[in-house]
Regions:
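Acidic, mature catalytic/reactive cores of soluble proteins
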Residues: 1-291
């Protein structure tokens, strides 16, 4: 996280590095739309539970990937407006293979302070593969044991859709990944809090995407399904219907992502993306106004 804060300042001083930084950032997001604990010289790193250390913990700081990424995207757009958008449909982006598994929606509702399972088997697999393939062992691999690659558009949308699957109307983004939001006064409310600050940043992120994406984009078929499910969910009449349908859409996406993404890419027409963004912004704006 702190590295990302430094990157923001660094990229203002050295703007030509900005797009490399964004690529590095996106290559470190997970299939379920979060960021690993840190990036070191040895690659992507995550926390593990240490039985002898009462302070050890696992989880995701939910706001990082929206806020820091957005700042970097805005800086890039200001300094080299055309360059970044040429990467939108390039299949050059990998996924961090963090061995955390978010539970089902029903389980998270039942106990939002116990929402993530540490996948010890996957953790051991990664460790045993590392001597053979190096840092690539910490990335998601396809059936041929090659690094699974997707487009920048897919990455940008997965991050957004993961957040929207935790949207609670008039409350904000539900903080259910065992970590507080860094930028929110409700810092302590892990599991039971919802962040209005992150919702406001999502609003800004979506406004950015409206300007930034000006043609059809190629995304994973699983992402497309999630986008359509959330589009329906967010237009439901009651708060409970929105929250339940969005939460279940997120769960169904995660089940597919954890089992192994197909690698199939489909075209999301610009008109459909724009309708989704504008409809969703209306719902978000109503929540922001009500607060």
């Amino acid at each position: 996280g702190d590295r990302f804060e430094i990157w923001e300042a660094f990229s203002l001083s050295y703007p030509l590095f900005i797009n490399s930084i964004i690529v590095k950032f996106l290559n470190a997001t997970t299939v379920d739309g979060y960021n690993p604990y840190r990036i070191t010289n040895a690659g992507i790193d995550w926390e593990v539970i240490e039985p002898e250390n009462p302070w050890s913990n696992i989880g995701y700081w939910g706001d990082h990937q929206i806020i820091y990424l957005l700042k970097l995207l805005e800086i890039s757009n200001k300094h080299t407006p055309e360059t970044l958008s040429t990467l939108l449909n390039e299949r050059i982006f990998a996924f961090a293979n963090v061995p955390y598994r978010l539970k089902s929606y029903a389980d998270i509702v039942a106990n939002p302070k116990d929402s993530i399972v540490f996948d010890d088997k996957l953790h051991q697999q990664v460790l045993s593969l590392t001597p053979q393939i190096g840092q690539d062992a910490r990335l998601v691999l396809d059936e041929q044991q090659q690094v699974l690659l997707t487009t920048m558009a897919d990455k940008l949308l997965i991050t957004l859709l993961a957040k929207l699957s935790n949207f609670v109307p008039n409350a904000g983004i539900w903080m259910n990944t065992l970590r507080p939001e860094w930028n929110d006064a409700n810092n302590a409310l892990v599991g039971y809090g919802a962040s209005m600050v992150t919702l406001a940043y999502i609003r800004r992120y979506m406004s950015f995407l409206q300007e930034f994406i000006v043609s059809d984009v190629n995304i994973a078929t699983e992402t497309y399904t999630l986008l359509q499910a959330l589009h329906s969910a967010l237009r439901m009449p009651s708060t409970k219907q929105v929250t339940d349908m969005a939460g279940l859409a997120g769960e169904q996406y995660r089940q597919k992502a954890y089992a192994g993404l197909s690698g199939q890419i489909v075209t999301l027409p610009l008109c459909e993306l724009r309708t989704f963004l504008s409809d969703t912004l209306e719902v978000i704006d109503s929540s922001i106004r009500n607060n």
